[in-house]
């Protein structure tokens, strides 16, 4: 299965929930987020995915939804945060979340969608700006993507997202392999050709590389199994109950 994101589809909302794990066994957190993905289908989520940072300590949950009003998104966000608190609050800290919309992109095969599957490599650039500068920043980043995409070896597609409730921009590249991604980072003078587009903006561009560890449609094995972290928590609870009974 693959997630397919149209370059410019006005009836689709994209959500990003960013987590910083607080446990050692990150696979347990991924396991719980897979189950969370299944439950979001009942709320209308049409596709979801999990990105795991290759070098940093970060997990991103991606969800695509039919376009909703601002009030509906606020209610949905509140519901999702409550669900996440109940399921993973002892495993990770929710550090950021936002709804975005795709507004442009490029692909090697000429299609108007970006596709990624489990195992694929993604790179994400993001920046927060002011509300007044958001449109200008977004189109500057799109201009960079369109002018450089064909020259970047190993890219499959590139996609730009614009924040809806927060003034932010996210640019995503899908790569053929981690090797191509590293080669581009190490061998290109990105600052030199990006600055003419971005020097007027007061921003801090953040960058990270992720591996896709799940997309909706993948088999989630052992749905009823208990993760290592859950067993530890259950063991603590049983111990406390035993002490109460002894007292």
Predicted regions located by residue number:
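Short S/T/G/P-rich N-terminal loop/turn motif that feeds into the first structured element of a domain
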Residues: 1-172, 176-247
């Amino acid at each position: 299965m693959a997630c397919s994101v149209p370059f410019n589809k006005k009836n689709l909302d994209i959500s990003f929930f960013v987590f910083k794990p607080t446990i050692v066994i990150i696979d347990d957190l991924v396991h719980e987020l897979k189950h969370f993905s299944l439950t979001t289908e009942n709320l209308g989520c049409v596709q979801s995915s999990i990105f795991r940072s290759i070098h940093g300590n970060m997990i991103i949950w991606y969800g695509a939804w039919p376009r909703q009003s601002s009030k509906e998104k606020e209610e949905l966000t509140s519901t999702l945060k409550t669900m996440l608190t109940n399921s993973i609050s002892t495993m990770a800290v929710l550090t950021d979340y936002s709804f975005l919309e795709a507004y442009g992109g490029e692909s090697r095969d000429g299609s108007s969608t970006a596709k990624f599957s489990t195992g694929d490599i993604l790179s994400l650039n993001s920046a927060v700006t002011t509300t007044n500068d958001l449109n200008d920043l977004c189109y500057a980043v799109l201009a960079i993507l369109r002018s450089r995409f064909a020259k970047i070896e190993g890219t499959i597609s590139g996609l730009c997202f614009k924040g809806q409730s927060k003034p932010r921009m996210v640019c995503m590249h899908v790569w053929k392999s981690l090797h191509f991604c590293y080669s581009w980072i190490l061998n290109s003078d990105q600052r030199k050709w990006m600055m003419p587009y971005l020097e007027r903006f007061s921003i801090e561009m953040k960058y990270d590389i992720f591996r896709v560890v799940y997309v909706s449609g993948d088999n989630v094995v052992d749905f009823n199994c208990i993760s290592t972290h859950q067993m530890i928590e259950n063991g603590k609870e049983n111990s406390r109950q035993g002490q109460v009974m002894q007292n």
